[in-house]
């Protein structure tokens, strides 16, 4: 498969030369790697890393090398989720409810989905976050995604419906990038897929490519028993027009969950 158009990687700054004081190591090439929290981190001496992981050495040195490698893998996995800088600080605790019962309920449903992800993953159980624009759906979806990546080492991705369609459309125009088959396989492969902004376009009966494409994505994950989270400002009655009635059935099957977001926009003064 060609390189991903949907799952980003950490940025890297131009490499430089550093010097290791360990006997026989000397100079090595180092680079700055972007961190999920917004910082940058320089890579260490590769010979020191290799020796710590492969040769007999002090247990604390070996443990530190393993911890560093795991931190690098986690950083890559978090970047690959596609969570943008605006939503990287979104957690369940930073979701402001102001003791509003509807907000507390939505927060609770999403938190439980994340904490019980192992069961939902085995069942391929979907979750729909439906409600008004700007009331925290993406915030809580990103909180779920970060939790399952950090706690379960899951592979996840959040992507808008429009971005899926654009990537597939681009694949028809060029032989240089991934094909439609590659893109659909990538969307099917992740442990948890979040499809955001479903229903933002105006449906065109008989000419609308989006519902059939989203149905294909959802159905493929359904066949593989992999969970999907869908975010939309449409309600349950309107949503089938944007994903197809069969895809709606797939999302409801096997105890599919729904978190209703029934309050007005919270974007003024906060992340939604």
What positions do the PLM features span?
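Short cysteine-rich clusters marking metal-coordination/redox-active sites
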Residues: 17-23, 45-48
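Cys/His-rich microdomains that often coordinate metals
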Residues: 24-32, 49-52
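Interdomain "pre-motor" coupling segment immediately N-terminal to P-loop NTPase/helicase cores
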Residues: 36-84
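N-terminal pre-Walker A segment at the start of P-loop NTPase domains
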Residues: 93-118
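Short glycine-rich substrate-engagement loop in P-loop NTPases that contacts/grips substrate
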Residues: 102-110, 145-189, 208
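Walker A/P-loop nucleotide-binding motif
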Residues: 119-141
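Walker B catalytic acidic pair
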Residues: 196-198
């Amino acid at each position: 498969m060609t390189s991903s158009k949907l799952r980003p990687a950490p940025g890297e700054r131009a490499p430089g030369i550093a010097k290791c004081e360990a006997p026989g190591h000397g100079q090595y090439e180092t680079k700055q790697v972007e961190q999920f929290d917004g910082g940058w981190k320089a890579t260490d001496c590769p010979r020191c890393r290799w020796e710590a992981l492969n040769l007999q050495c002090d247990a604390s040195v070996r443990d530190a090398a393993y911890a560093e490698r795991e931190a690098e893998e986690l950083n890559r996995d978090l970047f690959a989720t596609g969570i943008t800088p605006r939503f990287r600080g979104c957690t369940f605790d930073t979701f402001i409810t102001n003791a509003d019962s509807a907000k507390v309920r939505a927060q609770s449903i999403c938190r439980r989905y994340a904490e019980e992800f192992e069961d939902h993953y085995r069942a391929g159980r979907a979750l729909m976050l439906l409600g008004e624009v700007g009331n925290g759906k993406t915030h809580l979806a990103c909180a779920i995604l970060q939790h399952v990546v950090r706690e379960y080492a899951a592979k996840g991705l959040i992507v808008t419906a429009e971005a899926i369609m654009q990537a597939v459309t681009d694949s028809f125009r060029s032989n240089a990038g991934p094909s439609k088959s590659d893109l659909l396989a990538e969307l099917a492969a992740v442990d948890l897929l979040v499809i955001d902004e479903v229903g933002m376009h105006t449906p065109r009966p008989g000419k609308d490519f989006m519902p059939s494409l989203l149905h294909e994505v959802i159905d493929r994950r359904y066949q593989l028993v992999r969970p999907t989270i869908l975010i939309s400002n449409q309600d349950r009655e309107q949503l089938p027009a944007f994903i197809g009635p069969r895809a709606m059935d797939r999302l409801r099957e096997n105890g599919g969950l729904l978190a209703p977001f029934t309050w007005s926009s919270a974007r003024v003064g906060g992340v939604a």
